[in-house]
């Protein structure tokens, strides 16, 4: 199936006046500030030079975690495949690194590019940590599990299982025909259960779409990805990258401040229904 619009296409709009990050429903100013574990406070030596616009060198040690592969670099963070030498397992390690606001200066240390970016950088950092703390509190097979998180080197890190699989968009494109009812039920039941878990804590995803659902290799169980709390906080504060929406999956209340409309659990339900539309028809729904 070939959809009429790539799911990675997003619309960038100005946030509503007074908008706050509600991806994770807590006060983003109340961040976790416990000191990093002793093993992480003094990382092992690394290469003498680190490129300011790239990830850390392969082989870098952050306590018991050794970076073995650069998985992805985005506008707000870097993800590495890593080895946990304490528990002898592969993990994914995510580093908060908003490239438009921060840089490295030849070391592991992350610093803001300019003092005028500091407030925005720190707000995103707090949101990143709070998201990690919230995800660490959840226990559902269709939600990303965070093993641990900490602050060091002027930034923050979170460690998660290394999940393997394809996103839902690519999975659907590989099917010889549209999925049947049983396939859709198998997809939807775990996702609706996962949403019940996060909604019970007044947490809203706000970015559900086919490319934010991974179908895990082997089990084909769906996994909900990318809460993106730091991205939205930075967008709200800069009003440049602003709130990022995927047309067709975002309900009308996400586009602007409309009297009588607010975001909530129903925002995610709309997006999930739009995902079902895509799965059945192979086409992105019309924008709300």
Question: Across the structure, where does each feature detected by a protein language model lie?
Answer:
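AlphaC helix of the eukaryotic protein kinase fold
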Residues: 103-137
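Protein kinase glycine-rich loop
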Residues: 68-75, 79
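Activation segment signature within eukaryotic-like protein kinase domains
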Residues: 187-188
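Conserved activation segment of eukaryotic-like protein kinases, specifically the C-terminal portion
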Residues: 240-254
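Protein kinase catalytic-loop region centered on the HRD/HxD motif
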Residues: 191-203
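Activation-segment/catalytic-loop signature of the eukaryotic protein kinase fold
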Residues: 149
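Conserved short submotifs of the Hanks-type protein kinase catalytic core
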Residues: 153-167, 171
């Amino acid at each position: 199936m070939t959809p009429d619009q790539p799911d990675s296409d997003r619309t960038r709009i100005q946030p509503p006046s007074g908008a706050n990050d509600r991806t994770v429903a807590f006060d983003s100013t109340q961040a976790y500030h416990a000191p990093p574990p002793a093993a992480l406070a003094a990382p092992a030596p690394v290469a003498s030079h680190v490129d300011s616009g790239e990830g850390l060198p392969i082989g870098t040690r952050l306590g018991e975690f050794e970076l073995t592969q650069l998985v992805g670099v985005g506008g707000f963070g870097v993800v590495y495949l890593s080895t946990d030498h304490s528990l002898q397992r592969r993990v994914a390690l995510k580093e908060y690194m908003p490239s438009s606001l921060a840089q490295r200066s030849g070391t592991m240390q992350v610093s803001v590019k300019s003092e005028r970016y500091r407030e925005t950088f720190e707000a995103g950092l707090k949101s990143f940590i709070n998201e990690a703390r919230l995800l660490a509190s959840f226990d559902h097979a269709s939600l990303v599990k965070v093993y641990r998180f900490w602050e060091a080197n002027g930034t923050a890190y979170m460690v998660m299982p290394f999940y393997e699989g394809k996103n839902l968009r690519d999975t659907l494109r590989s099917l010889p025909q549209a999925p049947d009812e049983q396939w859709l039920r198998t997809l939807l039941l775990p996702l609706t259960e996962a949403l019940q878990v996060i909604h019970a804590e007044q947490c809203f995803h706000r970015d559900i779409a086919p490319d934010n659902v991974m179908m895990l290799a082997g089990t084909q169980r769906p996994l909900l990805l990318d809460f993106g709390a730091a991205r939205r906080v930075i967008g709200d504060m800069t009003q440049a990258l602003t709130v990022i929406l995927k047309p067709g999956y975002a309900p009308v209340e996400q586009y602007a401040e409309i009297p009588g409309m607010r975001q909530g659990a129903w925002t995610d339900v709309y997006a999930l229904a739009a995902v079902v539309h895509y799965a059945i028809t192979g086409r992105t729904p019309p924008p709300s």
